[in-house]
């Protein structure tokens, strides 16, 4: 089926409408917080403690996630560009949604540097979900997904952090598990029966894999900042960085080991190195600020590197062939399963907390055992950590079904590409001259009068071996 992918009016109107709504809502509801307001001057503000972490998280969202998805040979523009678009819209909507739940003072949402970090966390979950549908949806569909995912993320985050009192410093549950299974549910709803017609573009080339590795390295380097960005100042934040650092390092070695072991000639697969090596940062997220101990963090990374790499080899093909889950980036192996592992590790670590390990004040401070939680024990905290993981999975699955089915994203007027034109930049981007393409035009107003054929690069005839004419 050939759908009209000309977005000349639909995309501009959608973007402008959303931004006008943001301007109005910000004008009505958003003001600076105490540290940013000129009425109360002080140079000792939260900004100077949090901004370095905010910078690192910001780079991860826009550079790390964006470039990680450039592995597709003909989808680099869209991977980086659409990630940029949905993240830019998502942070605005996240500031409002999270503000209404967490930062409302009177009738105003007060915004400071901590809001910016939390908004980036929310958008990181959106970027995770983007990986599942990469190459198969239009930018309008992505904006719609972002709007509803940010909304559901804020609700789920409020339930976990405010009602269940769950500890999730690095977002193993709220960010990675939610984003992964929301995205996987949506991509299952949007299943493409004839995606094999675009299979040749679903592969990588040398240069695209190299660009994707840049994204991996940015994510890997800055993940300690990501997991510690909103932890309490002092020992909690310090522990979160150390635990993440150790888990990431161990994950690299086991990912490389398993990748080599699974190849009959012992060669490495770049897909595994790009996507399995950062999984240790995901898995240690919930327990990052707990007394996991450095050796415990190494164990988490060790196990996660093995499971993530095995997932790319065996689980992803199984999900596509048996369950019709077309996971473009393999987010189930980088974010989904490691996120669940992180939730379980957090629950076990919390349940095993003791006075000998934490001390009385440390136990109260680390788990907020005061006020509403003053009668809680470590086992109670561990039990509620499991509840939080289950709630997150339920919210992600139900939310993905609602967005995929309830919003009828399969209808052709969203401008999505047809099955034979997935994973192709030329559908939505002006391509440089001389760049070969296998794009089949879908807009009837631009189709040639004859039958549509894939365009191919012009090849000049080879020179003759001799310029002397041949005579019989």
From Swiss-Prot:
Glycans are attached at residue 435. SUPFAM superfamilies: Ammonium transporter. InterPro entries: Ammonium/urea_transptr, NH4_transpt_AmtB-like_dom, RhesusRHD. One of its GO terms (cellular component) is plasma membrane. It holds the Pfam family Ammonium_transp. Residues 1-9, 73-76, 136-139, 192-209, 263-294, 358-388, 472 are cytoplasmic. It is found in: Cell membrane; Apical cell membrane. One of its GO terms (biological process) is transepithelial ammonium transport. Residues 31-51, 98-114, 161-168, 231-241, 316-336, 410-450 are extracellular. The chain crosses the membrane at residues 10-30, 52-72, 77-97, 115-135, 140-160, 169-191, 210-230, 242-262, 295-315, 337-357, 389-409, 451-471. N-glycosylated. Keywords: Ammonia transport, Cell membrane, Glycoprotein, Membrane, Transmembrane, Transmembrane helix, Transport. It is a multi-pass membrane protein. It catalyses: NH4(+)(in) = NH4(+)(out); methylamine(out) = methylamine(in); CO2(out) = CO2(in). GO terms for molecular function: ammonium channel activity; ankyrin binding; carbon dioxide transmembrane transporter activity. Homotrimer. Belongs to the ammonium transporter (TC 2.A.49) family. Rh subfamily. Ammonium transporter involved in the maintenance of acid-base homeostasis. Transports ammonium and its related derivative methylammonium across the plasma membrane of epithelial cells likely contributing to renal transepithelial ammonia transport and ammonia metabolism. Postulated to primarily mediate an electroneutral bidirectional transport of NH3 ammonia species according to a mechanism that implies interaction of an NH4(+) ion with acidic residues of the pore entry followed by dissociation of NH4(+) into NH3 and H(+). This is Ammonium transporter Rh type C. It comes from Pongo abelii (Sumatran orangutan).
């Amino acid at each position: 089926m050939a759908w009209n992918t000309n977005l000349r009016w639909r995309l501009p109107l959608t973007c402008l409408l959303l931004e006008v709504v943001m301007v109005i809502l910000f004008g009505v509801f958003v003001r600076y917080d105490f540290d940013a307001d000129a009425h109360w001057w002080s140079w000792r503000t939260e900004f100077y403690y949090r901004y370095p972490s905010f910078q690192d998280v910001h780079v991860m969202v826009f550079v790390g996630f964006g470039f990680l998805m450039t592995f597709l040979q003909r989808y680099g523009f869209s991977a980086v560009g659409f990630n940029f678009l949905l993240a830019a819209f998502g942070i605005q909507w996240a500031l409002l949604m999270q503000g209404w739940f967490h930062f409302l003072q009177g009738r105003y949402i007060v915004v400071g540097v901590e809001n910016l970090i939390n908004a980036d966390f929310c958008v990181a979950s959106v970027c995770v979900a983007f990986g599942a549908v990469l190459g198969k949806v239009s930018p309008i569909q992505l904006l719609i997904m972002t709007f509803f995912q940010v909304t559901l993320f804020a609700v789920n985050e409020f339930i976990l952090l405010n009602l269940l009192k769950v500890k999730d410093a690095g977002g193993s549950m709220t960010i990675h598990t939610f984003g992964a299974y929301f995205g996987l549910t949506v991509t299952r709803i949007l299943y493409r029966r004839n995606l094999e017609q675009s299979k040749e573009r679903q592969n990588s080339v040398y240069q695209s894999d190299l660009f994707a590795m840049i994204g991996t390295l940015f994510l890997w380097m800055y993940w300690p900042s990501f997991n510690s960005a909103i932890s309490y100042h002092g020992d909690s934040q310090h522990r979160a960085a150390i635990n993440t650092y150790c888990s990431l390092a161990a994950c690299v070695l086991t990912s490389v080991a398993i990748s080599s072991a699974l190849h009959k000639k012992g060669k490495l697969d770049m897909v595994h190195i790009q996507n399995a090596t950062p999984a240790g940062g995901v898995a240690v997220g919930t327990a990052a600020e707990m007394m996991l101990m450095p050796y415990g963090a190494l164990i988490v990374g060790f196990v996660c590197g093995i499971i993530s790499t095995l997932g790319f080899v065996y689980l992803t093909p199984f999900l596509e062939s048996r369950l019709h889950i077309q996971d473009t980036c393999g987010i189930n192996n980088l974010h989904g399963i490691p996120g669940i592992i992180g939730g379980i590790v957090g629950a076990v670590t919390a349940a095993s907390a003791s006075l000998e390990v934490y001390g009385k004040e440390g136990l109260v401070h680390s788990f907020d055992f005061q006020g509403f939680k003053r009668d809680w024990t470590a086992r109670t905290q561990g039990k509620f950590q499991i509840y939080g993981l289950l709630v997150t999975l339920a919210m992600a699955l139900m939310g993905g079904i609602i967005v995929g089915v309830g919003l009828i994203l399969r209808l052709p007027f969203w401008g999505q590409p047809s099955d034979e034109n997935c994973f192709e930049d030329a559908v939505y981007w002006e391509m440089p001259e001389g760049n070969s393409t296998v794009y089949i035009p879908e807009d009837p107003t631009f189709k040639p009068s004859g039958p549509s054929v894939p365009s191919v690069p012009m090849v000049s005839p080879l020179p003759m071996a001799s310029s002397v004419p041949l005579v019989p």
